[in-house]
Amino acid sequence: MLYLLPNLLGDTEGHSHVLPSSVDRAVSGLDQLIAESEKAGRKFLKRFAFDPPKTFRDIPIHLLNEHTDLKQRKELLDQVVQGQKWGLVSDCGMPCLADPGEEFVLLAREHGVEVKAFVGPSSILLSLVLSGLGGQRFTFRGYMPKEKTLRIKELKAMEMLSRKERCVYLFIETPYRNDALLQELIEHLEEKTWLCAATDLTLATESVITKKVQTWRKIKRPFLDKRPTVFLLRG
């Protein structure tokens, strides 16, 4: 059995307001955990209670991240196929959305492993519904290109397609580059385009601002650097 376990979107005291009790029950019964890093996996486990003498330190953690090649994923899957209760967790939010877990789940499906997902916070879905830009048609673009010329070209292409297809585009950036990306969006998008910045979702510092670009150019901009943010546009 492979459990897809939701994680928090940031540091909060307690988790009952975000994660359902079914996640507590699933985690308390785990035999193994797959995580992006030992530190993040152990931090996740530490939030939950286990029946004594078992503690969060007793759960073995196996790494699955951008450095895990196909051979290593298959070797990990060989262990999952043998049985026990395995959990898969992302550093934050739902696994398999913009993280390496998606390819592993496909492998698990191909080999007949039973997979169960649990409800939890997703910055993609939360930003979409909070933005007000509509959820009928949308595309998650993921991370933007690192090279500025390519990035601006991609932004203009998304804006054009959004207007043509009447859909919303969602995308993200490495948090320390958020302010620079917001500046580029305001400079290069057309003034009638809708732009949303959804920041620190589910946290006490949550901020969601949706305005046309022409209004963004006039207001005081929020400080977004090092704060997890999802950007959305609708042409």
Summary of predicted features, one role per range:
Residues 62-69, 144-148:
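Conserved helicase motor
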Residues 1-64:
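Glycine-rich, flexible N-terminal cofactor/catalytic loop recognition
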Residues 27-33, 112-116, 168-169:
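Short active-site oxyanion
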